[in-house]
């Protein structure tokens, strides 16, 4: 996963969702935004719309809200590299494993940003983004697509996730899934989604890599 694992970008996403939904007359707390991490924008908007109005948002509403959310997010300072992430990726490479990014993001500058922060780690053909899949997390499709791209079986891979929906997707794909709780949610939320291991941070995961 990228947001919340490689980059400390989730506070910006949560704040942007909270502000913009309020502007459009909806209630979405920052903590709830973390619960929806990994969903498509339309799915997040419709969950709140159904809860508060009893029906889905219109296509026009979804477009307007998501555009406003993107603009709000782009005003935020650039997210820093998550502490410990580079060290974990270096160990992954040293072990002869293949590092891949599986993200719901569709930013066109993604590879440039990854290469700038994690030089020599990722290859474009070994990335799964919003453009590669029809269904977002919690559907297992993004992780199944990653296995297909790398020519791997589920028992030959590891998933590293911070989001409940991402953990759910990894588990549903049949992959050993490690949760790293870099956000404000209780650990139990990640355990409940089926995480096989859980660490409180990327540095903690790095220190226990040999496990």
Where do the protein language model's features map onto the residues?
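Active-site neighborhood of HAD-like aspartate-dependent phosphohydrolases
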Residues: 2-32
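Conserved phosphate-coupling serine/threonine residues in phosphotransfer and NTP-handling enzymes
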Residues: 5, 103-105
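An amphipathic alpha-helix signature
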Residues: 14, 18, 41-46, 107, ...
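Anion (oxyanion) recognition and catalysis
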Residues: 22, 93, 171
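Short helix-capping segments at alpha-helix termini
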Residues: 23-26, 53-60, 118-123, 151
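A metal-dependent, Asp-based hydrolase signature
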Residues: 38-72, 83, 91
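Short, acidic loop-to-helix structural element flanking the phosphoryl-transfer center
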Residues: 74-101, 108
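Asp-based, Mg2+/Mn2+-dependent phosphohydrolase catalytic module
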Residues: 86, 90, 106-211
């Amino acid at each position: 996963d990228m947001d919340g694992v490689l980059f400390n970008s989730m506070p910006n996403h949560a704040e942007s969702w909270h502000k913009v939904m309020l502007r459009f007359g909806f209630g979405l707390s920052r903590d709830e935004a973390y619960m929806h991490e990994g969903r498509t924008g339309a799915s997040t908007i419709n969950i709140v719309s159904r809860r508060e109005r009893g029906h889905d948002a219109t296509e026009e509403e979804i477009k307007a809200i998501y555009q406003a959310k993107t603009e709000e997010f782009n005003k935020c300072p650039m997210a820093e590299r998550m502490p410990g992430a580079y060290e974990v990726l270096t160990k992954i490479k040293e072990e002869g494993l293949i590092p891949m990014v599986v993200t719901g993001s569709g930013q066109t500058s993604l590879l440039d940003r990854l290469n700038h922060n994690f030089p020599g780690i990722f290859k474009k053909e070994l990335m799964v983004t919003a453009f590669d899949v029809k269904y977002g997390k919690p559907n297992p499709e993004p992780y199944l697509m990653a296995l297909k791209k790398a020519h791997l079986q589920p028992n030959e891979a590891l998933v590293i996730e911070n989001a409940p929906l991402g953990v759910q997707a990894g588990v549903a794909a049949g992959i050993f899934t490690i949760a790293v709780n870099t956000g404000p949610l209780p650990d139990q939320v990640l355990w409940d989604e089926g995480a096989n291991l859980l660490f409180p941070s990327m540095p903690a995961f790095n220190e226990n890599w040999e496990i």
